[in-house]
């Protein structure tokens, strides 16, 4: 008869308990399709897409994508904004929630139009989805993003305001932001972000929808809410994020001359934690999703992910404050024209990136970078071994 090793038994039971506690995460079955959740005694749905290379050992981001008013996730995904390919390429969880009926209008919507009574709690519906997915999958809780089209874009701003403890950044296409002062009659508190928040907006100057007019709408029109202009939106978020007052402005190459529109890119840099506010102003653009309808010079899907993925709830990922730059390293001239030189670096890998995180060139040791063919704009130089970076400007 053998004796039990109690130390071994304790370790075994501890390990068994640990695995049981986390089994729903470690052994979650990847399921792509509609899932249900009961929220406020109402059965709600969302379309979930988990990339094939998901691993429970590697926490990954979540991107919510919200359909417009009167829409549904499947039609929206198939005909307006299909980001499943991006989710596969960049390894993030993609979620298309489904809105419910506004009791005051009978239409499918994210924003309650009622002027009295308690508004629907759609913000907590999204919070409940985040909690459910985080229970079943390994999620990077600092990298949860939201985007949407039309009313879905408006709702993305609402999440940036009212679920900011969970949301790192948002992007809105053809959807304005509600004025917090005018929202008071719906029972909401003022917009109250808690951390530097990355914001992208893609508005059309010729959009005729009342809730997404470039110049704002409709104070004095006897409507329930006031929708901010594009300039008011960027002013609010650049002030909150403490970015540069003057944006970097450039014209996007007009690759499609038949779509009747062009794009101007405006980027407000150097916000708290390195966050940015970016506007892709579609000049001549209507109530569209660029790359699918209307303007074809950009793909809004790619623009949104390239922008949001640079940030987490702490700001720009791997951002360094200028006070931490190594004083022995000198980059000159800056601003530069046809070249710049890096001094004070030995046997270090030096990488040059553009404003959108694309690697332009890499070198080792002190060296001269020939920049004759680079476009004017902002670039970032990263010295790997010293873990420092410089912002450079080509004039």
Residue ranges: model-predicted function:
Residues 37-53, 57-145, 149, 158, ...:
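Serine-hydrolase catalytic machinery in alpha/beta-hydrolase-like enzymes
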Residues 168-169, 174-248, 254-261, 267-273:
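The feature captures the conserved acid-bearing segment of alpha/beta-hydrolase catalytic domains
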Residues 99, 205-208, 284-286:
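Acidic beta-to-alpha connecting loop that harbors the catalytic carboxylate
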Residues 1-30, 319-320, 380-381:
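Bacterial Sec-dependent N-terminal signal peptides
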Residues 26-62, 75, 89, 118, ...:
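A domain-start/cap signature at the N-terminus of enzymes
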Residues 64-68, 174, 203-204, 283:
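The conserved beta1-alpha1 loop
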């Amino acid at each position: 008869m053998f004796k039990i090793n109690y130390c071994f038994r304790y370790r075994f039971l501890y390990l068994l308990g640990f695995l049981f506690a986390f089994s729903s995460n470690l052994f979650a079955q990847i399921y792509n399709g509609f899932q249900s959740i009961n929220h406020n005694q109402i059965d709600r749905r969302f379309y979930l897409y988990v990339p094939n290379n998901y691993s429970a050992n590697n926490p990954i981001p979540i991107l919510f994508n919200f359909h417009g008013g009167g829409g549904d996730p499947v039609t929206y995904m198939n005909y307006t904004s299909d980001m499943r390919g991006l989710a596969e390429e960049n390894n993030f969880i993609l979620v298309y929630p489904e809105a419910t009926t506004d009791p005051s209008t009978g239409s499918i919507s994210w924003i309650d139009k009622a002027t009295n009574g308690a508004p629907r709690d759609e913000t907590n519906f999204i919070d409940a989805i985040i909690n459910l997915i985080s229970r079943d999958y390994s999620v990077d809780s600092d990298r949860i993003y939201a985007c949407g089209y039309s009313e879905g874009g408006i709702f993305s701003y609402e999440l940036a305001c009212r679920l900011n403890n969970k949301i790192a950044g948002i992007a809105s296409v053809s959807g304005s932001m509600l004025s917090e002062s005018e929202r008071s009659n719906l029972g909401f508190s003022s917009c109250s972000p808690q951390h530097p928040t990355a914001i992208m907006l893609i508005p059309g100057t010729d959009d005729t929808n009342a809730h997404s007019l470039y110049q704002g709408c409709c104070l004095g029109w006897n409507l329930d809410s006031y929708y901010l202009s594009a300039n008011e939106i960027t002013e609010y978020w650049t002030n909150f994020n403490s970015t540069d007052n003057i944006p970097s402005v450039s014209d996007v190459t007009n690759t499609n001359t038949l779509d009747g529109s062009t794009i101007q890119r405006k980027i407000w840099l150097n916000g708290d934690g390195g966050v940015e506010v970016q506007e892709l102003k579609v000049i001549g653009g209507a109530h569209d999703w660029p790359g699918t309808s209307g303007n074809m010079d950009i793909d809004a899907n790619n623009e949104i992910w390239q922008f949001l993925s640079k940030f987490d709830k702490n700001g720009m990922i791997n951002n360094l404050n200028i006070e931490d730059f190594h004083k022995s390293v000198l980059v000159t001239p800056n601003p530069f024209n046809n070249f710049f030189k890096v001094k004070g670096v030995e046997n270090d890998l030096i990488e040059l990136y553009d404003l959108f995180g694309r690697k332009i060139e890499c070198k080792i040791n002190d060296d001269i970078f020939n920049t004759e063919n680079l476009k004017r704009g902002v670039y970032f130089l990263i010295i790997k071994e010293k873990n420092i970076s410089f912002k450079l400007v080509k004039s």
